[in-house]
Amino acid sequence: MNQSLGPSEPEKPQDNTAEDSTEPTPDNHRADLSELRGIPKKQTGIEGFEDISHGGLPLGRTTLVSGTSGTGKTLFAMQFLYNGIVKYQEPGIFVTFEETPADIIRNASSFGWDLQALIDRGQLFILDASPDPEGYEVSGNFDLSALIERIQYAIRKYKAKRVSIDSVTAIFQQYDPAGVVRRELFRLTARLKQANVTTVMTTERTDEYGPIARYGVEEFVSDNVVILRNILEGEKRRRTIEILKLRGTTHMKGEYPFTITNDGINIFPLGAMQLTQRSSNVRVSSGIEKLDEMCGGGFFKDSIILATGATGTGKTSLVSKFLERGCLDGERCILFAYEESRAQLSRNASSWGIDLEEFERQGLLKIICAYPESAGLEDHLQKIKTEMMAFKPSRMAIDSLSALARGVSQNAFRQFVIGVTGLAKQEEITGFFTNTTDQFMGSHSITESHISTITDTIILLQYVEIRGEMARALNVFKMRGSWHDKGIREYLISNAGIQIRDSFRGYERIISGSPTRINVDEKNELSRIVQNVQALEEEGL
């Protein structure tokens, strides 16, 4: 074994205490059932993990973090230690069976973590158990007694509260049989539990959804199991984390997306989002007077609006008017564009009389442009979250969601939309999204991924053929918590943007794409309109 890295190498103790000489057994390793209730937890400091684990890792127990190569196991183990030192003032021990201490320090620096400074201050100790590059042979019975004693001594010397071991797979690769290694790992976890340290132990698996660990025994010596995955969906990889078990305590079930940023692991606990945000009765303008009238006075301040329609129906024009109105009212606005460049957006907006560049110069508008294929959905979500938290807008827009849906599963896309809408509602931001439908004319699904239930207001834009000419139709299809115009209005796109006209009179089946002319009794129609107006006046609308 190589030398350990720290202020000074802990010497192997010359005598063992009675406690150390007592061999652990499965009976005294298992806690009494009464002790399993209300187990205290230690926070990891990893963003989102406390949400899905209901508070962190069980105090004084061992957690197995399993995953295929490149899933972030070593990062999880090191971030657990680093956050413990920096955020909670808890010294830690990192036991490495694979990488050298120098490599670990160098890799951590890419996240801005100065491990050498922590080592110099005696807050972190790296115990090097990596194989000797010269190679060696082991004869006789294998046991981890020497390593266990070194770890115990380091825990006492540095008053460590956290231990990370990376990775136990290396032990199986060096020694056999597996049953003997399992026995020694059981001894190790028992000693760590006696020392009352919270431990993260990593192991490798061969398949994303196969056995938990490569050798099939590692999970039985730990109290808790966390699985990291890096799944190939289409042409993109998607990272997820799943807590398989936290013995004796509760946690959230299922997989949750995460990404690796410059700050380390960032988990999106979508299932942990609470519907506790306040609901505002304040209205904000869409930037189009007629559309505000159709929506009963405008959109609700904290609502999510979805404009859906075929290409060329004016969705980006609606977004531009929405953002212009916010900037004119002195509100900060942010646009995430995934189909057009900044120059193209500015040029198109100027044709409608909107100067986006001037709003940017005033600091009222920020435009983020990116190709959907440039990153995975989790990375896009993290980018949106980072930009919104830094810029703190009152309005945000995404143009378009359908571009982000290319090449990903419906479940991943839906989770992305939930993440964005949840963030917008949490920050009381008015969100405006666009969605491009595949069908050029006629009835169609509003959204293929069934995200319509997540949004508060849906504006349906559609092409219709009337008397041999192409026209455009607009309908406020849905608006939660408010009266809205049910009519199907004709609209034009001119130099002033979208201009909404009256309803299509004398036609039915507009939405189906097969408009049919009907005879209208003008006298009865006028009487009906007067009655509707009187009814609205009586209701105070």
From Swiss-Prot:
Domain spans labelled KaiC: 21-268, 282-541
Cofactor binding note: Binds 2 Mg(2+) ions per subunit, one in each domain. Mg(2+) is required for hexamerization and phosphatase activity.
Pfam families xrefs: ATPase
Residues at which Mg(2+) 2 binds: 316, 339
Regulation: The interaction with KaiA enhances its phosphorylation status, while the interaction with KaiB decreases it.
EC number: 2.7.11.1, 3.6.4.-
Residues with Phosphothreonine modification: 453
Stored PANTHER family: CIRCADIAN CLOCK OSCILLATOR PROTEIN KAIC 1, PTHR42926
Function of the protein: Central component of the KaiABC oscillator complex, which constitutes the main circadian regulator in cyanobacteria. Complex composition changes during the circadian cycle to control KaiC phosphorylation. KaiA stimulates KaiC autophosphorylation, while KaiB sequesters KaiA, leading to KaiC autodephosphorylation. Clock output pathways impact the RpaA transcriptional regulator. KaiC enhances the autophosphorylation activity of SasA, which then transfers its phosphate group to RpaA to activate it. KaiB and KaiC together enhance the phospho-RpaA dephosphatase activity of CikA. Has a weak, temperature-independent ATPase activity; ATPase activity defines the circadian period. The phosphorylation state of KaiC modulates its ATPase activity and effects KaiB binding.
Complex formation: Homohexamer; hexamerization is dependent on ATP-binding. The KaiABC complex composition changes during the circadian cycle to control KaiC phosphorylation. Complexes KaiC(6), KaiA(2-4):KaiC(6), KaiB(6):KaiC(6) and KaiC(6):KaiB(6):KaiA(12) are among the most important forms, many form cooperatively. KaiC interacts with SasA, activating its autokinase function and leading to RpaA activation.
Domain notes from UniProt: In the homohexamer the 2 domains (called CI and CII) self-associate to each form a 'donut' layer; the compactness and local conformation of the domains varies over the cell cycle and impacts function. CII has the autokinase and autophosphatase activities, both CI and CII have (weak) ATPase activity; CI has the clock pacemaker role.
Family membership: Belongs to the KaiC family.
Protein name: Circadian clock oscillator protein KaiC
Source organism per UniProt: Parathermosynechococcus lividus
Record gene name: kaiC
